[in-house]
Every structure is written in structure tokens, then in C-alpha cells.
Amino acid sequence: MKRQTLALIGLLIVASLFPISEKVEVKVSVKHPVVVQTKATMEQKRANKKMADTFARVGFGWDKRQRACVHLIFTKESRYDHLAKNQQGSSAYGIAQMLGEKSTDPATQILRAFHYIEQRYGTPCAAWRHHRKGWY
């Protein structure tokens, strides 16, 4: 990878970690076309699944049964694709297809989904029971 590309990637990572509220003009000269990723790769999906399982086990203390329910929900919603867009036309986005989700960061999406599940349903399996009826 060329230095300019690496520098641009570094700039984008820093900008996503430290958002600013004022407008900043950035001029970038790109000689090669920029490829915008619209779907997660299988490798990314596997990493997202592993991250979700780790967060559920370590961060939330959910047992194997609860983690299986997380897997059912995330598989049905997006197959762990953090770039998934809702096929029904709503603004739902990401791994858990949450409304209003703006982050493309899988860790942020997973944590927001887990907090939502915990606050609204108590456990992932309670969320899954509700989800089977349609929405969650």
C-alpha cells in the first residue's frame, strides 16, 4: 500500500475516533479510484461474530444459552454484516439492524444492541422470543 493511501486511512481512522463539530476542509489528491465497501467480507463477519460472543460472555456475563440467542438475532438481522442496510426500506442499519444507527464500527453496533436488549428485554433469549413474532 502506498504511503498516501496509508496516510489517508490513518486520517480517516483518527477522524472517526475524534469527531469535531466544526467544518474542516480537507483536500485529497487521489490518483487511483476509491473503492467504497458496501458489504462485509466473510472474514469481517467471522470477526464480528467472535467479538459479539466475547462481549456477551465477558462484558455482560451471558451464558452459552443467551449467547446462542444473540447469534440467532444477529444472524437473522444481518448475518453479522456491520454494513448491512435494511431491505424493507427503513433506516435500520448494521449488525442488529437498529434504527438510527450511524456507526459503521462493529464494536459500537454490538454494544449498542446489547444495551438495548438488556434494557428492553432483560436477556437475549427474551428478545429472541419477541423477535420471532416480528420486531425486537
Q: What do the PLM-derived regions correspond to, one by one?
A:
Residues 45-136:
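Peptidoglycan cell-wall recognition and remodeling modules
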